[in-house]
């Protein structure tokens, strides 16, 4: 039996230049490390991200206190534990914290250790990480939901909707999916330049031109798809992350303009852009507690992927409530929303049993860590959301998926999205 002999944490930086935590777990001869990501638009019910809140240290954003918790409290509790018993490791971490949202130790401390332990277990077994999750054979590659225009909390350009994405629906393999996205992105860049707009990028690598109107952004995306020789809604589909929590006041929303309107009016406007632009996926169309609005949208849309992110926060209890209310048909999976690998796998497993599509996701403050690429393949998740073909912390995940596809060889195939 391989046991945990040592755990060491350190403060490093995420892709937004903010401090985050890296944990390294050691066995007798090997070690593995993992870096915890961080979100910008976060749900109220997410597991707690613990920071020092000392303005003299990184303007209150340092995690040195959290690092110390790993190096003392967590390390002491886990030393001697079987590295291959992920459930036990995570249960010890959960019980040691003792709170619903992991406020004592911080989900960032817990997750970094949980991920590092999972990596080390695979390393000791000398198997690829993706082979250590839920699937034991017949691995599927996810379709990329590639962010090509950033708005909302991810860019300072006035766009209401946070993410405009493309999905290469007709790609026969992951390599082809990447090629299709590459072509559309490069044609989009040319169109943006032609309009005299900036091609600077947002937090997740998508372009962030100064466009204040959602439909103008959508027109640009459609033009880029057409210019690339593809059919919108058939070869390539447009997908949105609205992040409606950021656009809500009481029971009204300002999604499509600065004017706040009712849920019913918002649904009418959604239906309009769905039909006009052949939108195939909408994430967080309404607020995290507006269950009725979500259910109404589900009743008023057909063949559209309605994705719960802030609604579910990778939490099994909230997912079960959403299922009973018919609130969505898909769930976004973010490891740091719940805080351990085991709990994340539990949510994915349940979501797939009830017929939901599972979409593995990065965070806007991410790193070179590629754990989620392996997680997507190892759970046969339908899609992965990990930014654009810009910024190395985003591209790192795509490169890992290409490596996995190459390793699988003729056994590699794409997941189902319809």
Curated annotation (Swiss-Prot):
One of its GO terms (cellular component) is phosphopyruvate hydratase complex. One of its GO terms (molecular function) is magnesium ion binding. Mg(2+) binds at residues 241, 283, 309. Its EC number is 4.2.1.11. Its cofactor is Mg(2+). Keywords: Cytoplasm, Glycolysis, Lyase, Magnesium, Metal-binding, Secreted. Pathway: Carbohydrate degradation; glycolysis; pyruvate from D-glyceraldehyde 3-phosphate: step 4/5. The active site is at 204 (proton donor), 334 (proton acceptor). It catalyses: (2R)-2-phosphoglycerate = phosphoenolpyruvate + H2O. Coiled coil: none annotated. CDD domains: enolase (cd03313). It comes from the Bacteria. Pfam families: Enolase_C (PF00113), Enolase_N (PF03952). It is found in: Cytoplasm; Secreted; Cell surface. (2R)-2-phosphoglycerate binds at residues 162, 334, 363-364, 385. GO terms for biological process: glycolytic process. The keyword Ligase does not apply. The keyword Metal-binding applies. Binds a second Mg(2+) ion via substrate during catalysis. Catalyzes the reversible conversion of 2-phosphoglycerate (2-PG) into phosphoenolpyruvate (PEP). It is essential for the degradation of carbohydrates via glycolysis. HAMAP family: Enolase. Belongs to the enolase family. This is Enolase.
